[in-house]
Each structure stands twice: as structure tokens, then as C-alpha cells.
């Protein structure tokens, strides 16, 4: 079984990546293959709502000048998908939002392409907005007819500066529990 994780943070190896890595380490210890993709520095265009994906029905977005189609294919090939984001003004990062919007249209246009795959949201927050971000990511999974594993709490870790989430014992334990329940 393979799990692909996307760090939607504008910072590589920051708090969001630390939380995702905690989940992945549990999955790897159970023998699962994992891959972490960092979206930092990528120019990912948002969906232009052209709906061409509904006429081509080829598992691809018509926009070809970024890596979104590569990422959609990685999600197709994996049994599990983790989408992680920091909170920016009470919502997910623009990179992750663009990926979700474009992948979401492709998923729906192609008969629920991710149906029955496991999807988990991971959120890094400083103070507020963690739950709305967590919910928004989970809505993508639900609309895509994916399975969302339970954890001990919401999959949110708190920290301000890089590395601070390691001090959020409850948040880190939640990620470990997510890894245990998400392995299927």
C-alpha cells in the first residue's frame, strides 16, 4: 500500500511537514510505502472553471504548465492521500487550494476517480482557523467519495515558529494516532 502526502505550506520542512512526517513515520513502521511532496516554491495555477475535464475525461486538467497532473496521477496510484496545510487567514494555503480545486474537478469529471481511497487532512495552526481548514480539506475528500480515518482529535497541531509543533504533545499524539487508524 502506498500513501502520498502533500505539504501545502509555502515553507519546506516547517510545522506542517513535521506533522505530516509524524503520520508517515507510523505508516512506514507498519510497512507502507510513503512519499512526501512539498508544494513550497511551486507555481500552481488555480482552476479556471473551463470544465474541459468533463469533455476530455482523461484524468487530467487542461492546464499543463505546472505539476498538478503529475500530482493527480500520484494520487490515482496511491491508496491513501494526506493533504497538509498551514492556516493562512483562517484557511488553507493557496497552493493546496489550487491543487484541490483542479484535482476536484478532474475527480468528479472522471467518475469519482479517488472513490474509496483513504484521505486525511493535517493542519498546522498558530492560533485560529485550524478547524475551518481541516473541514475544507475533508470536504474535498467527502465530495470525492473518499474514506476519512478517525483519530483521537482533529488532526491539528499548534505552533508559531518553525519546529514549535513538536512541543504540542496532544497535536503530535493525534498525528501518531492518525497514522495508526489510517493504515487500514
Q: Over which residues does each language-model region extend?
A:
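N-terminal beta1-alpha1 ligand-phosphate binding loop
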Residues: 2-32
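Cysteine-centered iron-sulfur cluster-binding motifs in ferredoxin-type domains/subunits
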Residues: 8-17, 44-54, 79
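Conserved beta-strand segments of alpha/beta enzyme cores
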Residues: 33-35, 60, 147
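Helix-loop-strand module that forms the ligand-binding subsite of alpha/beta enzymes
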Residues: 62-153
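A short beta-strand-loop structural module common to alpha/beta enzyme folds
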Residues: 32-42
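Cysteine-cluster motifs in flexible loop/terminal segments that predominantly coordinate metals
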Residues: 42-75
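Glycine-rich phosphate/pyrophosphate-binding loop and the adjoining helix
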Residues: 1, 24, 29-30, 70, ...
